[in-house]
């Protein structure tokens, strides 16, 4: 199975997500409007699918969902390399390979959900931008998994950049620049 074969953006999983988005609510749910684009991690997506502050809220939500899904897809391809190599052998048990891939996708989705929710604790209290949310994602994951062996943070940074989500107030998009820093002096305890 090649990377293209396992591209989640063109699989049944994405179709299920879109179907769920259509049926989950009235109007334009973000999942219904998500447009995922395959490509190199540093290649921007079509301008029509990039972040634009003038877009309607659901369309902006779709950009955020697409960026996160793009990052998850890249990590999935990385983490399943050995399973795909096994699948390429002539007598690989396809049912077992499929089960391994499904289990990895489920585990990865749970890990990404954990990062996405934990990041909320690191966001400013009001008027959060997508760039600030990326900083919160990077910080939350760095606190939980300091060494990042599977490149989750790198995948998130590349995906947000691909979808045109900018981060104000940082010199570059390195992990060190994106991490939220603690206060320079300790804050007094709250009584």
What are these regions (language model features)?
Residues 1-191:
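Zinc-dependent metallohydrolase catalytic domains
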């Amino acid at each position: 199975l090649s990377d293209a074969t396992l591209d989640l953006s063109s699989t049944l999983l994405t179709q299920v997500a879109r179907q769920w988005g259509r049926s989950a609510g009235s109007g334009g749910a973000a999942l219904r409007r998500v447009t995922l684009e395959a490509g190199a991690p540093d290649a921007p997506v079509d301008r029509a699918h990039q972040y634009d502050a003038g877009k309607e809220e659901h369309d902006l939500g779709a950009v955020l969902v697409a960026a996160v899904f793009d990052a998850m897809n890249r990590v999935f391809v990385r983490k399943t390399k050995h399973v795909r190599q096994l699948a390429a052998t002539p007598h690989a048990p396809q049912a077992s390979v499929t089960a391994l891939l499904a289990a990895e996708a489920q585990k990865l989705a749970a890990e990404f959900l954990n990062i996405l929710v934990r990041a909320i604790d690191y966001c400013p209290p009001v008027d959060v931008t997508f760039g600030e949310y990326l900083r919160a994602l990077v910080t939350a994951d760095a606190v939980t998994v300091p060494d990042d062996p599977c490149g989750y943070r790198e995948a998130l940074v590349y995906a947000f950049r691909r979808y045109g989500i900018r981060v104000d107030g940082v010199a570059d998009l390195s992990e060190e620049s994106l991490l939220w820093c603690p206060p320079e002096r300790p804050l007094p305890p709250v009584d």
